[in-house]
């Protein structure tokens, strides 16, 4: 089990980090009271959860007394954990609070800088126990995601972090609105005009064999699959955790369906989690 505790300065990006880990398949909890950490970890041990990330920070008030005793309890129970600590400069934190117009959890007199300095002092000890410290002062949300992916790449070894949805559709019924990329395969040979194939669909081998036997299909599939093999890792590096590819033909029953199925087979061989939806196959 991978158990990650995310903590650090308020406004330093803990919510961004938690969203990243959730997109990467972690079970995530925000603002977990420190006193519940060891009990929660124990529950996770007896579940099917294998990757857990929790945010526990100064919002828990009785932060240090509870947190350090909970970490000690984890160690006694033999539960491995890591601590990620996020910080940023006073100037950046003040600017972020002004931009969001949110109140610092320790700000009782309207002095944000005093609250930030107090929090920094209180967090000094837990910072010293952190496995990884990231200063987000000069990082955008996207850049923080890049850094997290780099730092925690070992958590995803052997797995593609991006999931892919492939939608086949018919242009006569409209293009899916949620597609990231749309491909038009109406140039491929059309089984609709073959009497024995007209009422069949691209899910059937006989239709697939017809489409695949043509050189234009074979050339297109090679180039298409090579392009997706190049593009998806690049989109993943830009922070996308899910990608939707729409493939259209005239009616959405033959060419687009076959192409979606063959693309799925290719992406599965590359380790991606793939879901296929044939939007118009029954129309």
UniProtKB/Swiss-Prot annotation:
GO molecular function, one term: GTP binding
Family assignment from sequence similarity: Belongs to the RapZ-like family.
PANTHER family: RNASE ADAPTER PROTEIN RAPZ (PTHR30448:SF0)
Binding site for GTP: 57-60
Transmembrane segments: none
Gene3D superfamilies: P-loop containing nucleotide triphosphate hydrolases
Domain of life: Bacteria
SUPFAM superfamilies registered for this protein in UniProt: P-loop containing nucleoside triphosphate hydrolases (SSF52540)
Record's protein name: Nucleotide-binding protein Hore_15880
Chain sites annotated for binding ATP: 8-15
Function recorded in the entry: Displays ATPase and GTPase activities.
């Amino acid at each position: 089990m991978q158990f990650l505790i995310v903590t650090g300065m308020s406004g330093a990006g803990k919510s961004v980090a938690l969203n990243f880990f959730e997109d990467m398949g972690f079970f995530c909890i925000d603002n977990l009271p420190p006193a519940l950490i060891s009990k929660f970890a124990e529950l996770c041990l007896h579940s099917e959860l294998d990757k857990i990330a929790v945010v526990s920070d100064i919002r828990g008030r009785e932060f240090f007394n509870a947190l350090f005793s909970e970490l000690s309890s984890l160690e006694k129970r033999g539960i491995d954990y890591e601590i990620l600590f996020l910080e940023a400069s006073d100037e950046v934190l003040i600017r972020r609070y002004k931009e969001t117009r949110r109140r610092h959890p320790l700000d009782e007199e309207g002095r944000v800088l005093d609250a930030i300095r107090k929090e920094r002092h209180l967090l000094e000890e837990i910072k010293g126990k952190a496995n990884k410290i990231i200063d987000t002062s000069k990082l955008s949300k996207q850049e923080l995601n890049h850094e997290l992916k780099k730092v925690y790449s070992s958590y995803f070894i052997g797995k593609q972090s991006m999931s892919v949805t492939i939608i086949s559709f018919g242009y006569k019924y409209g293009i899916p609105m949620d597609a990231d990329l749309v491909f038009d395969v109406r140039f491929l040979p059309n089984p609709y005009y073959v009497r024995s194939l007209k009422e069949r669909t691209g899910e059937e081998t006989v239709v697939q064999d017809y489409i695949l036997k043509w050189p234009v299909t074979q050339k297109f599939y090679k180039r298409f699959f090579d392009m997706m093999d190049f593009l998806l890792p690049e989109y993943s590096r830009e922070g996308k955790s899910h990608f939707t590819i729409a493939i259209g033909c005239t009616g959405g029953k033959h060419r687009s369906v076959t192409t979606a199925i063959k693309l799925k087979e290719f992406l599965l061989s590359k380790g991606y989690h793939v879901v296929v939806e044939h939007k118009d196959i029954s129309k």
